[in-house]
Design a protein with these regions (language model features):
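Alpha-helix N-cap and loop-to-helix initiation/capping positions
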Residues: 28-32, 58, 62, 95-106, ...
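Beta/alpha (TIM)-barrel catalytic core signal, keyed to glycine-rich beta->alpha loops juxtaposed to Asp/Glu
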Residues: 131-295
């Protein structure tokens, strides 16, 4: 599997395994979580995407049980996690409202909790999960730089940031923001034309695409499915693999974040790499999603 270079000494797999549903599985045993990770590794999927809030602040600890039981796995993977969303559940059950917190104190406490819960010494990439209207860029930028200097975090990036949010935070930092994780799929295609991907390409910033199947909406779109089914039949893969290949075809260095608890589906995640879309086929999918031909 191809790699996406993040820094001189850090790269991500072209497909990333998303762990946001880890706590929703009917089997949350350590052995089952380990089986998922090993199924990913067998295909060259080495990058694991987490967030402190996933599973109501439980998913990192579930993952940590596997890293504690099988510590050799740590050297085979890259761990991405996120912070700044505070929801009134779990460790934040006393909160009165769901909110964002990019204060130095909260980010530092979140990193310490993530390190402890996942049984690791360093986070490979820490993302600010959502833009915070109350973000003091100087304070947030300084604490992110400090976390890198401390050795607790290797790199930092953002998630769901618009170009202006990204530029604001970057202006207050010494280290480079190395990625932006955004919602992107054939059916959620506005980043192709609203400036989001153009900004990231211009600045050579890798893109992590969450919900690359549109939260399942792709399968409800008859026009899109007609094209996906045809191409899937020709390539001998499932339509979902074609939907992922649609993102991989773009030149913006997009790494789809795929989340499933089904081992057989995990085993098929790399099938997207078998699909090579030419320009016309890509536009067939795109125009089917648009509901009209391009101008």
């Amino acid at each position: 599997m191809d790699r996406i270079q993040i820094t001189d000494d850090l790269s991500f797999s072209q497909i990333i395994y998303g762990m946001w549903r880890l706590g929703d599985d009917t089997d949350t045993s350590q052995s089952h979580v380990q089986a998922k990770v090993e199924a990913c590794l067998a295909q060259g999927i080495t990058t694991m995407d987490q967030a402190d809030i996933y599973g109501g602040y439980t998913a990192e600890a579930l993952f940590g049980e596997t890293l504690k039981a099988a510590p050799a796995l740590r050297d085979q993977i890259e761990i991405v996690t996120k912070c700044d969303i505070v929801a009134p559940v779990g460790r934040h059950s006393g909160a009165r409202v769901k909110y964002y917190d990019t204060s130095a104190a909260h980010i530092t406490a979140s990193v310490e909790a993530s390190l402890r819960d996942m049984n690791i010494d360093v986070i490979d990439c820490l993302l600010i999960h959502r833009p915070d209207p109350l973000m003091d860029a100087m304070e947030t930028g300084e604490v992110l730089d400090d976390l890198i200097a401390s050795g607790k975090v290797r790199t930092v990036g953002v998630s769901n940031f618009k170009p202006w949010d990204f530029s604001l935070l970057q202006s207050a930092m010494e280290n480079e923001l190395v990625a932006n994780q955004i919602e992107l799929s054939a059916t959620n295609h506005t980043p192709f034309t609203d400036g989001d991907l153009a900004f990231l390409q211009e600045n050579d910033i890798p893109v992590m695409a969450w919900s690359p199947l549109g939260g399942g909406s792709i399968f409800d779109n008859a026009a899109v499915m007609n094209v996906l089914n045809r191409v899937a039949g020709e390539a001998g893969v499932e339509p979902s693999a074609v939907a992922v290949a649609f993102l991989l075809r773009h030149p913006a260095r997009i790494a789809p974040v795929m989340g499933t608890n089904n081992i057989s589906r995990i085993n098929a995640l790399s099938d997207a790499l078998k699909v090579k879309l030419d320009r016309q086929t890509w536009f067939e999918i795109y125009t089917a999603a648009l509901g009209r031909e391009v101008a």
